[in-house]
Amino acid sequence: MNEQYKQLGVSDAVLTYGETILASLRERFDAIDAIAEANQLKVINAMQKNRVAANHFNLSTGYGYDDEGRDTLERVYADCFGAEAALVRPQITCGTHALALALGANLLPGDELLSPVGAPYDTLEEVIGIRESVGSLKEHGVSYRQVDLLPDGSFDLDGIRAAINEKTKLVTIQRSKGYATRPSFSVEQIGQLIAFCKRCKPDVICMVDNCYGEFTELTEPVNVGADMMVGSLIKNPGGGLAPTGGYICGRADLIERCARRLTAPGLGREVGANLGLLTSFYQGFFLAPTVVASAVKGAVFAAACYERLGFRVVPPAAETRHDIIQAVELGSREGMIAFCKGIQSAAPVDSYVTPEPSPMPGYDSDVIMAAGAFVQGSSIELSADGPTCPPYAVYFQGGLTWYHAKLGILMSLQKMQEAGLISL
């Protein structure tokens, strides 16, 4: 096997270093596998309960009336995640679209949106109206305020209490760190925050952006009081097979509003053809717990490898995981480029491409991205990216198989060593 690694460009020194790190992670990997097993059984139970059958994979076109496969998939999602209802559609194009849909469906002029966990993803700034944009919530009369986290990364409960007022209609909680170096939140932490917000205003809607977090723990935000939970099918729940799509699940009345926003009042969830994508949606969801476990193992391995070399990693290698993202602060633009070159060179697709920093809409700095994916933009497939500015953090995620994630990390070390940025 060592010879096969050498053929792919991994030196003996890097391979030996990687195996030394791996030997220290056996118990961690066993714990990750235990979570995957429990979540796999949860998915199977939801599929069996809803009597998933071969006819549920049939193509529908046009209006999509009476699409039993689509409707059954939504019941599977709802049951698996512990929600009253779910909307799972290829017409929801990405995570940002799903979030914009959930917000737009449940916020009216005069309402206020609150983020108690600081600034949202950059892509949501135009949705909200933090940056001026046509069609934003701000343009439609929805105000916004945020409460930043405390310096130690904990919730500013006094600030949140002061921010919640009679106009506060919806609280949005971003589970994952995004392009930040704060810790991602556990389901338990999210539950505590939701309970606090509900004590301040019992009728406030609590929505969780669950992107990158599905199946990393035994429970999901809906299980601890979230009224809505939102995510993308080209991330965790699509299992690497879904070619597009997003989901929203939670309270039935809120999900119905989302359905009517997605299509039209009077139509709601009754229309929306599946366009032949249901097999990939069902099979991807079935595989998702195992695929997510592979990605989590890759994140833990990356953290352990780079932490021992003296780099700051978020979360630390020994910390329990709440999403699939691993941030590594490499300290220089050159380090980010070398790391991403390693990830790209390990890809099954476009392995010959050399990633370079380049401008990207919505970002003040050039962004570098490495991804050789079967599905464009898929974050559950092995990838790495980040803005090339201090602290020069690269965000590593994904890996449909653990062995691919392992190769990616070894190749990142190889490129870092060849650039003279690390010594093994």
Give each language-model segment a name.
Residues 78-102:
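Short loop-beta-helix segment that forms the pyridoxal 5′-phosphate
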Residues 79-83, 135-142, 348-349:
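Short helix-loop-beta junction
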Residues 84-88, 111-114, 169-170, 203-206, ...:
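Structural motif
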Residues 307-424:
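Conserved C-terminal alpha-helix-loop-beta "cap" of PLP-dependent enzymes
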